[in-house]
Curated annotation (Swiss-Prot):
InterPro entries: G-protein_beta_WD-40_rep, RACK1-like, WD40/YVTN_repeat-like_dom_sf, WD40_repeat_CS, WD40_repeat_dom_sf, WD40_rpt. Pfam families: WD40. GO terms for molecular function: ribosome binding; translation regulator activity. It comes from Flammulina velutipes (Agaricus velutipes). PROSITE patterns: WD_REPEATS_1, WD_REPEATS_2, WD_REPEATS_REGION. Belongs to the WD repeat G protein beta family. Ribosomal protein RACK1 subfamily. Keywords: Conidiation, Repeat, Ribonucleoprotein, Ribosomal protein, Sporulation, WD repeat. This is Cross-pathway control WD-repeat protein 2.
């Protein structure tokens, strides 16, 4: 264990279903967004008080099934969400109104991502397609050739403007890298032995990490198109996210939240909250979503007990 431990700060209560995704904003560090199986997105105002870390400032309603993913535009003005109702929605965060509905997927949309310049949107679905959209809600490209043969569980744009790629993963156990300029497949990454739930791209766009059923987190070199190394997560990996400012990777697994130091390939910390009311059959709540604050000092984690929990790095 490294000296950077994490300290629990508190939890945010408001959702009535699993907290499925979390989005933080560099432009507005006092705001975070969470998506949930209660069909809503909550805009939280962070107060960081002793007794309460934040409160629901606004609730975005409109989806009529689970909300699976949410992202914020880089100016902090808009949010984009995906849902099992087969649609995406673009929201004006100042008014809470839906400004666009994106219709085209024929099954649950599981993942959504904004390009670095916020001009393009990518979505992945249980209909086994990846769609590229503009902000007007027009589908500009439908990736079907060489696409996943099973559900597309996660899609992410590289944050690196000079290397515009999309990384996707699916239940076909493949991580795919797509060249945005030509909408063409660049690399297939094989190695996982079970379905893949999540993929994350490092802040500089050089690495991708993937994880899922086999409990192994695999790291891929996006420039060279090769497997770098694997980290043992020890349980099903639900979500992965790179730290914005440290060489860390955070993994939400079925049993705990693990933070890996990628330099030493060691575990920085392992987070297991103290759950007050353990659910049916004594199953502990699982962490299914994670996000770092833009400055990398705060970790937000969403759980199947409908709670959002917050930790701070105490370096």
């Amino acid at each position: 264990m490294a000296s950077d431990q994490l300290r629990f700060l508190g939890s945010l209560e408001g959702h009535k279903g699993w907290v499925t995704a979390i989005a933080t904003s560099q432009e507005n560090p006092d705001m975070i967004l969470t998506a949930s199986r209660d069909k809503t997105i909550i805009v939280w105002q962070l107060t960081r008080d002793e007794d309460s870390y934040g409160y629901p400032k606004r609730i975005l309603t409109g989806h009529n099934h689970f909300v699976s993913d949410v992202v914020i535009s880089s100016d902090g003005q808009f949010a984009l969400s995906s849902s099992w109702d087969h649609t995406l929605r673009l929201w004006d965060l100042n008014t809470g109104a839906t400004t666009r509905r994106f219709v085209g997927h024929t099954s649950d949309v599981l993942s959504v991502s904004f390009s670095a310049d916020n001009r393009q949107i990518v979505s992945g679905s249980r209909d086994k397609t990846i769609k590229l959209w503009n902000t007007l809600g027009e589908c500009k490209y439908d990736i079907k050739d060489e696409c996943h043969t099973e559900w597309v569980s996660c899609v992410r744009f590289s944050p690196n403007v000079s290397n515009p790629v999309i990384v996707s993963c699916g239940w076909d156990r493949v991580v795919k890298v797509w060249e945005l300029s030509k909408f063409k497949l660049k690399t297939n990454h094989y190695g996982h032995t079970g379905y893949i739930n999540t993929v994350s791209v490092s802040p500089d766009g050089s690495l991708a990490a993937s994880g899922g059923k086999d409990g192994i987190t695999m790291l891929w070199d996006l420039n060279e198109g090769k497997h770098l190394y694997s980290l043992e997560a020890g349980d099903i990996v639900n979500a992965l996210v790179f730290s914005p400012n440290r060489y860390w990777l955070c993994a939400a697994t079925a049993s705990c939240v693990k933070i890996f130091d990628l330099e030493s390939k060691s575990i920085v910390d392992e987070l297991k909250p103290a759950y007050t009311d353990v659910q049916d059959e004594g199953r502990q709540p699982e962490c299914v979503s994670i996000a770092w604050s833009a400055d990398g000092q705060t970790l937000f984690a969403g759980f199947t007990d409908n709670q959002l929990r917050v930790w701070t790095v105490t370096s």
